[in-house]
Amino acid sequence: MAAKTGSQLERSISTIINVFHQYSRKYGHPDTLNKAEFKEMVNKDLPNFLKREKRNENLLRDIMEDLDTNQDNQLSFEECMMLMGKLIFACHEKLHENNPRGHDHSHGKGCGK
């Protein structure tokens, strides 16, 4: 799937895959994220993710351990997508936070704003 073709959602999916591989190919196995790759991805491509926690190193370690379901100290694409799913859900909830219409359907400030 080319980045310039397809629907907005298809392009978004392609972007997520491409960003994952941008980091997974740096060291070790080309299809998993090690701790350094995961940390770099979160710090560079999810800069607002740990904004409140001030990029707490222990929190990053704990998140990776929680996602690493097979305990191989690597995150597969599937394991990493568990984080993306949780972030998307949290962002969706934040969009509706303090909105008098709730989920009936107006959006406030999104994630990272």
Curated annotation (Swiss-Prot):
Cellular location(s): Secreted; Cytoplasm; Cytoplasm, Cytoskeleton; Cell membrane
Chain sites annotated for binding Zn(2+): 21, 31, 92, 96
Post-translational modification: Phosphorylated. Phosphorylation inhibits activation of tubulin polymerization. Methylation at His-107 by METTL9 reduces zinc-binding without affecting heterodimerization with S100A8.
Keyword Phosphoprotein part of the UniProt annotation: yes
Membrane topology field: Peripheral membrane protein
Positions of post-translational Pros-methylhistidine modification: 107
Signal peptide (from-to): none
N-acetylalanine PTM positions: 2
Gene Ontology annotations for the cellular component aspect, listed alphabetically: calprotectin complex; cornified envelope; cytoplasm; cytoskeleton; extracellular space; S100A9 complex
Iron keyword on record: no
SMART domains per the UniProt record, alphabetical: EFh, S_100
Key words of the record: Acetylation, Antimicrobial, Antioxidant, Apoptosis, Autophagy, Calcium, Cell membrane, Chemotaxis, Cytoplasm, Cytoskeleton, Immunity, Inflammatory response, Innate immunity, Membrane, Metal-binding, Methylation, Phosphoprotein, Repeat, Secreted, Zinc
Annotated Ca(2+) 2 binding sites: 68, 70, 72, 74, 79
Domain EF-hand residues, every copy: 13-48, 55-90
Tissues expressing this chain: Highly expressed at sites of inflammation.
Domain of life the protein comes from: Eukaryota
GO biological process: actin cytoskeleton organization; antimicrobial humoral immune response mediated by antimicrobial peptide; apoptotic process; astrocyte development; autocrine signaling; autophagy; chronic inflammatory response; endothelial cell migration
CDD domains given in the database record: calgranulins (cd05030)
Gene3D superfamilies: EF-hand
Positions contributing to Ca(2+) 1 binding: 24, 29, 32, 37
Record's function text: S100A9 is a calcium- and zinc-binding protein which plays a prominent role in the regulation of inflammatory processes and immune response. It can induce neutrophil chemotaxis, adhesion, can increase the bactericidal activity of neutrophils by promoting phagocytosis via activation of SYK, PI3K/AKT, and ERK1/2 and can induce degranulation of neutrophils by a MAPK-dependent mechanism. Predominantly found as calprotectin (S100A8/A9) which has a wide plethora of intra- and extracellular functions.
Assembly notes: Homodimer. Preferentially exists as a heterodimer or heterotetramer with S100A8 known as calprotectin (S100A8/A9). S100A9 interacts with ATP2A2. S100A9 interacts with AGER, and with the heterodimeric complex formed by TLR4 and LY96 in the presence of calcium and/or zinc ions. S100A9 binds quinoline-3-carboxamides in the presence of calcium and/or zinc ions. S100A9 interacts with amyloid-beta protein 40. Calprotectin (S100A8/9) interacts with CEACAM3 and tubulin filaments in a calcium-dependent manner.
Protein name in the entry: Protein S100-A9
